């Protein structure tokens, strides 16, 4: 089973791919993203150990949403010793699936925020 995850907006999207069958889920994560993402994945996929690869939308998008979503996805891929790939744009799902199906593994997917982060800029 391959999972495709997009946490770049307040609405999170998960696609579970098993063979040719795809199941799509979406939910409003808001401030519950970190706490609820792993639980949601477990509920929708059954056993996390059945996941054979992860594709993620790496941006651009919400700083917090991408940071939390990619942290969970990267940690899950590392702990399960499975490949992870990232992609951008409207066809990110197809691109991610293609990468996984030819055996690519980015090991760690870094977010693309679309602009420089201003996390160290002083507040006025």
What is each stretch, according to the model?
Residues 1-42, 46-49, 64, 79-124:
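Oxyanion-binding and handling regions
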Residues 53-58, 64-84:
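DPxDG-like acidic metal-binding loop motif
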